[in-house]
Amino acid sequence: MKFNIIFTPGIVKYLRLFTLSLLKYSSCSFRLISNGCSQEEDVMLTSFCEIDTKLEYYKLPFEGLVEHSVAITHLQGIEDGDYFCFMDPDIIASGDFIVQFKPLLEQYSGVFSGTVIWLDKAGQTLSHTEKIMGGRFNITEYGLCLGSTFFAIYNNKILSNYLENTLITFDKYNSWENIPTDCQAKLIQSNLKMQRYDTAKVLNILMQRDGEKFIFRHSHHLYHIGGLSSLLVGPLSKVKQRGFIRGLNKISSRKYLKQIITRRSITQTKYIRRDVADYFTTILKALFEGKKLPPKFRIQDQKISQDMETARQLIVQMFDEYHHLLNL
């Protein structure tokens, strides 16, 4: 089983470390995708892929950086394996994650995972009051799986046949106005009419409407930081910089942290994402530059607090064990 991992400008140097954890704890192979990366980063990826036969380098045939949905559509088009798999580059593994998913592939056409570590169950559940189906939503309040582009495994034959027969792709139908009337009718019947849909949401909903079975399953061996790509890309991020020092000052406030976890608006969720991404980016840069690590990010929610601390420890342990492979 081969996973596509898409690297964007600014993250190659640091997030190769996360790929090493995937290699360490699974028998899977990984295709590392250059999406608009610089020549220096492409060389870095190419050299990195030479350390293990389970690694493969691939550069997207587009000019510059393209949207995630466009990249996924292209990658599915060239996939000739039994499964089409992809995951975000800022997911670090603590154990053999694939063992949990293999039995599910006999029952489901799509298996998803990889929720970001700072998001609780309520933040992953789409309520009927929402107008935008963002990427963080993996299930509706009625129990329908919405899937995820954080970590996805599709039965490639079933997916390819569906895409060919319906002409729906990962990069189409992100806004209501662009959705054909027959597909709109199915979404209305499912009580899922939205202003906008994140990548693959419409595809996943319609495939299930037409009889396929999908499931989202949390993995105790995958820790998804979330937001590192957009943070390190810098100017290409849609969220304003807020500053890590400002974040550390507020991080010490339990009241503020409680507000972070309970906020649900899209704008606020982006800021939560940036606060956590700021924290882990600072950890990575400190490790790679031989500097002191930042204070721990403490959150009142015990589950989220523990997951963030575990992710921090994993990053430090992986760096101590494998930094010699990163050509620092």
Task: Give names to the regions the model predicted.
Residues 147-248:
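Catalytic core and acceptor-binding pocket of nucleotide-sugar-dependent glycosyltransferases
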Residues 40-79:
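Active-site-proximal specificity loops/subdomain of glycosyltransferases
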Residues 20-29:
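Short, acidic, metal-binding catalytic loop of nucleotide-sugar glycosyltransferases
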Residues 99-183:
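Conserved catalytic core of nucleotide-sugar-dependent glycosyltransferases
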Residues 84:
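Short aromatic/hydrophobic "clamp" motif used to bind/position activated sugar donors
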Residues 88-92:
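The conserved acidic donor/metal-binding loop of glycosyltransferases
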Residues 28-39, 60-61:
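Short beta-strand/loop segment that forms part of the nucleotide-sugar
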